Amino acid sequence: MKEFLTAATSSTGGASLVGAATGQLYIAGATFICFLLFGAWGAYWKYRDSKAIQEALNDGDLNKALKIRGR
């Protein structure tokens, strides 16, 4: 425990703050990229279902359109 306290207090406060902020920025960036990927994936599936519903309605198959919508 003594070694930990010595190491923790021997570094400058500014360096530890910058290191913590850099780590948080990496995590925030990775999270943002994940949000973008999942958003694009969801938009693709919504577009795909919308096209399938439109085709079913054009063919006059209301049951198929409702089944796709209910997914």
Swiss-Prot record:
GO terms for cellular component: host cell plasma membrane; membrane. Residues 1-24 are cytoplasmic. It is found in: Host cell inner membrane. The chain crosses the membrane at residues 25-45. It comes from the Viruses. It is a single-pass type II membrane protein. The keyword Membrane applies. Its main location: host cell. GO terms for biological process: killing of cells of another organism. Keywords: Cytolysis, Host cell inner membrane, Host cell lysis by virus, Host cell membrane, Host membrane, Membrane, Signal-anchor, Transmembrane, Transmembrane helix, Viral release from host cell. Signal peptide: none annotated. Residues 46-71 are periplasmic. Accumulates harmlessly in the cytoplasmic membrane until it reaches a critical concentration that triggers the formation of nanometer-scale pores (pinholes) causing host cell membrane depolarization and endolysin refolding and release into the periplasmic space. Once the pinholin has permeabilized the host cell membrane, the SAR-endolysin is released into the periplasm and breaks down the peptidoglycan layer. Determines the precise timing of host cell lysis. Homomultimer. This is Holin.
